[in-house]
């Protein structure tokens, strides 16, 4: 078991290793056994993070002119769907010094704007470098090898990853910039947001729909929106907006639950509850500014959830959602120094759409 830990929120979490590290290890082991006839149970590789990994070779298959090796992906305490899958590498003797190919279960890139060009197999640049570097360490002088990376369960697993959204079909991607998986890595989540936005731009979109998660996607689909132009930004609102500006996006529509959106109204651009939780304060403040009875303001302020708060707010104060919506719009446009035009659709689970600011915003500009 890989023995590297981090402290996250007071918890000791075990790190893991990427699909790129698995592929590099499997390829190195297969290439070494192809020419040395050794029987290996472990193989060592170095990672871009300068952490040496000693990985177990789970399975080996040999033929007259090839060797196949398997390494099991261990993501540590990171809740990734690729954890536990088999990453295989096949090494075959070749007249050419080094060739990398992809087989079953490795995705093919069908869109623009990613790290790998359209039409190529989805093994990212850093893993490609790692695989070649490690294979060359064990390749005898004057000998050549063709390495094929494949993942038997890749096509099935890929349906649960971001690949379908990124227009990568047929399998998973071989990923990793450091070789090490850091549990609950904020940088990894941000990178997926950045990639998805750049991919949408490369596909020709000038305006995007930003969503917090699957519920927002369901709501957008329910409203008949073009999901192809949507990006799930998770809690990283500010980061997503910066990426939109960087990619010269002209307009964004945020579709979200009032519990998330109300935080933006208060100027919070990371909506994780540990970073910012002013949902009910925002609603109570708006009610007070509208002249609502003190009992209603206090009841909303003391509520446990925004869903509960919505039930308390009477028809008399339904304009609260429009007020919050305009504040969200202004916060976003101020945050991006006017580079983005913002529109907002706010909903809750019990009452549905609370405010659809699209036509209203257009009328007021």
Swiss-Prot record:
One of its GO terms (molecular function) is cobalt-precorrin-5B C1-methyltransferase activity. Pathway: Cofactor biosynthesis; adenosylcobalamin biosynthesis; cob(II)yrinate a,c-diamide from sirohydrochlorin (anaerobic route): step 6/10. Gene3D superfamilies: CbiD-like (3.30.2110.10). It comes from the Bacteria. InterPro entries: CbiD (IPR002748), CbiD_sf (IPR036074). Keywords: Cobalamin biosynthesis, Methyltransferase, S-adenosyl-L-methionine, Transferase. It catalyses: Co-precorrin-5B + S-adenosyl-L-methionine = Co-precorrin-6A + S-adenosyl-L-homocysteine. SUPFAM superfamilies: CbiD-like. GO terms for biological process: anaerobic cobalamin biosynthetic process; methylation. Its EC number is 2.1.1.195. PANTHER family: COBALT-PRECORRIN-5B C(1)-METHYLTRANSFERASE. Belongs to the CbiD family. This is Cobalt-precorrin-5B C(1)-methyltransferase. The gene is cbiD.
């Amino acid at each position: 078991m890989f023995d590297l830990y981090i402290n996250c929120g007071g918890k000791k979490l075990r790190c893991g290793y990427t699909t790129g590290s698995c592929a590099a290890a499997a390829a190195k082991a297969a290439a070494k056994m192809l020419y040395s006839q050794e029987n290996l149970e472990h193989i060592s590789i170095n990672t871009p993070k300068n952490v040496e990994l000693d990985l177990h070779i789970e399975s080996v298959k040999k033929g007259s002119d090839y060797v196949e090796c398997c390494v099991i992906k261990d993501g540590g305490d990171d809740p990734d769907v690729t954890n536990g899958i088999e990453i295989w590498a096949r090494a075959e003797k070749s007249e050419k010094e080094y060739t990398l190919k992809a087989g079953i279960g490795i995705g093919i890139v069908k869109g623009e704007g990613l790290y790998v060009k359209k039409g190529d197999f989805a093994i990212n640049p850093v893993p490609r470098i790692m695989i070649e570097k490690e294979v060359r360490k064990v390749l005898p002088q004057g000998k050549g090898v063709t390495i094929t990376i494949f993942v038997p369960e890749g096509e099935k697993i890929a349906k649960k990853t971001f690949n379908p959204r990124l227009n990568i079909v047929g399998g998973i991607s071989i990923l990793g910039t450091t070789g090490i998986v850091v549990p609950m890595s904020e940088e990894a989540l941000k990178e997926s947001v950045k990639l998805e936005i750049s991919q949408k731009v490369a596909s020709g979109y000038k305006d995007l729909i930003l969503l917090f998660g699957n519920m927002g996607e369901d709501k957008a689909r329910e409203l008949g929106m073009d999901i192809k132009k949507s990006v799930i930004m998770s809690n990283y609102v500010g980061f997503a907006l910066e990426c939109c500006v960087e990619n010269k996006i002209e307009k964004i529509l945020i579709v979200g639950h009032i519990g998330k959106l109300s935080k933006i109204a208060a100027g919070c651009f990371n909506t994780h509850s540990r970073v910012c939780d002013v949902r009910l304060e925002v609603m109570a403040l708006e009610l007070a500014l509208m002249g609502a009875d003190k009992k209603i303001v206090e009841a909303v302020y003391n509520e446990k959830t925004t869903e509960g708060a919505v039930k308390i707010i009477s028809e008399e104060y339904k304009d609260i959602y429009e007020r919050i919506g305009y504040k969200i719009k202004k916060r976003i446009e101020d945050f991006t120094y006017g580079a983005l035009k913002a529109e907002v659709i706010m909903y809750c689970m019990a009452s549905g759409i609370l405010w659809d600011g699209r036509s209203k915003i257009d009328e007021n500009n």
